[in-house]
């Protein structure tokens, strides 16, 4: 693995009917069903310029001979994807999964499809997202018993909360969970959670009149006026853990970060009416979102793992939303309810030893 020799004669170009300029992101694996090596390549139809994942096979990759097969997946009229980038394919239990990233539709991020066979047909789950818009180019790997997905959290240009999403950033890792119906969920890897073993106190900075605090439990009565409790900075690396309940179908509740003396903040909130977890910047523009169906008066577990400006929120070990929040580590954070009554209980803060 240290010394490589470039084979100058090796070249694969797009077959007839496909766009040669965007013909990239090869993913090679040994296909147990075919007893051959398979290679996925991201490209587009030509004409038409619609996203497609081509499939090539080879009995001997070193020979440079790859035979084109029927496409693994072509974007549907409902998808209408321009490009499906950084594709990955794997089997988990009885299902095959196809993962790809898409950055041009109104639902940007890392998506997946599932099937009973590598040849399909591929079905789209009700929620086909692995994470929101700030987790991209997800690729997977297994340690033999668990499977993880690795993606990057985009930086912004300029590098502040109002900057535009740029390319590349910090790596974030989720553990993939297979639900009983075959759909996928995400949770924080146990090895990551174990790093945060030093307990610290959540120091209250300020509370609005409609917040009740009692030994790590907080009731936010924000139906009429915004309810907000803020805490002092928890530093560069920390994990926030709590249980929360939403009292009604309308309104939002969640967390605020990078609160400053002017009263501005970024927020990640739970929106039952929209069926989403949503990240907003400091001028209340939506920047990322993840579908999640909430129910009133139901308790949910939430974990937030932060390092620098990266903030990753997990709910019930089932869903994740990754965010970029500049200035978080130097500033206050808190809990918020707007048009909503909510409770946060057993609030715990831990840091690495």
Feature names for model-found ranges:
Residues 1-4, 56-64, 113-121, 179-184:
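Short loop/turn segments immediately following beta-strands, especially the blade-tip
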Residues 1-30, 63-87, 121-139, 192-195:
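Surface loop/turn signatures of beta-propeller and other carbohydrate-active proteins
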Residues 325-353:
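Ligand-recognition surfaces built from glycine- and aromatic
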Residues 89, 240-242, 298-315:
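Short tryptophan-centered beta-strand motifs in secreted/extracellular beta-sheet-rich domains
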Residues 219-278:
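Secretory/extracellular carbohydrate-interaction modules
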Residues 153-210:
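Beta-propeller fold recognition
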